[in-house]
Amino acid sequence: FAAAEHAHKLQPTSESAAGCAQMCIKKEDYAGAIEYYKQALSMVDNDEDKADYLYRMANVYVSLHNYQQGVAHAQQALDLNPEDGRCYLLMGICYASAKVYDDPILQRSVFWVACDMFRKAKTVDSSCATDANKLIATYSQYFPSKEDVFFHRDLNEGQPFRVGGWIGKTTTCRSKAE
């Protein structure tokens, strides 16, 4: 690692910065990885490479359990490359991992938004369909029951629901298949 870092300092390129970031990730030095990805990002001109580095940074933030930054960086990558389904998959995983409600029934609304993202991933990028379908099957099991939806004053099956907290997305209220 020291040799790669030294070579990067002598002749920095986006590739050498990304390589150093990968080595930092292997050592679980996520702060270092983010810094190297920022360097890599500053050295590229084309949107495809920028989107790739932003996606990689998003993954590092997920490793740090900083889901809000994970979503923010995945969204920046999508702004540059709207057909990258991996970004939607990652955003869905971030939403599913987020804690935005104390109410255990409302907390399950994060899974609706997550599944929306997984569906979007396979719509824009067919190479993500298998992973998206697996994630939908996994996370839709955590939707609230029909009974929980019926008895909760804030929920109506099939109606729009705005998920609060930092997510701030409107989705459709759904119950799990029984």
Descriptions of predicted regions:
Residues 45-48, 62-65, 92, 97-106, ...:
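Short coil/turn linking the two alpha-helices of tandem helical-hairpin repeats
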Residues 120-178:
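Terminal, low-structured helical/coil segments at or just beyond the last alpha-helical repeat
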Residues 13-14, 22-25, 47-50, 59, 83-84, 86, 93, 128-129, ...:
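Residue-level recognition of tetratricopeptide repeat
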Residues 76-79, 96, 106-130, 136-140:
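TPR/TPR-like (Sel1-like) alpha-helical repeat modules
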